[in-house]
Regions:
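Short, charge-rich amphipathic alpha-helices with coiled-coil/heptad character
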Residues: 1-11, 45-62
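C-terminal amphipathic alpha-helix
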Residues: 1-41, 65-143
Length: 143
């Protein structure tokens, strides 16, 4: 192939869309970390009316989500490196079938692993949402 798939056309558009989604995920993760820090501070207060059980559960779920996000982030960075290696390999010698297949195989492995990690992140976010709703309901009962 003689086209620059990385920087023009449909593949480029997909890469841009993925990068925008990743940036959105990073912003959301930053908000979750801020919320987690606030909940930890609230939980450390000596207040008998605080819903301690719900607070602890939500904090634990947020901590797990943060750890799994770090793993997702590591796989994402490896995927982008493998993607760049693939594009570089194709650009260097489009006739190097073995080199291209190796680079594509590596890219596919990271893509598959990232997909699995995305499923874990999604499940964690569902748990965070459920726990936050329980905490919210318990906080409303404090009034």
């Amino acid at each position: 192939p003689n086209a620059d798939f990385q920087n023009v056309g449909k593949i480029h558009a997909l890469i841009q869309k993925r990068e925008a989604a990743y940036k959105q995920l990073e912003r959301a993760q930053s908000q979750l970390e801020s919320a987690s820090n606030q909940l930890v501070k609230i939980n450390s207060q000596d207040n008998a009316t605080l819903p301690k059980s719900e607070l602890k559960k939500t904090i634990a779920t947020l901590k797990l989500a943060k750890l799994d996000h770090k793993t997702f982030d590591a796989y994402y960075k490896e995927l982008t490196d493998a993607e760049q290696d693939f594009f570089d390999t194709v650009a260097a010698d489009p006739s190097d079938k073995a080199g291209i297949e190796d680079a594509l195989g590596q890219l596919n492995q990271y893509d598959s692993s990232l997909g699995q990690q995305a499923d874990i992140v999604e499940a964690n976010l569902q748990s965070v949402t459920a726990d936050a709703q329980s905490l919210h309901a318990a906080a409303l009962k404090m009034k």
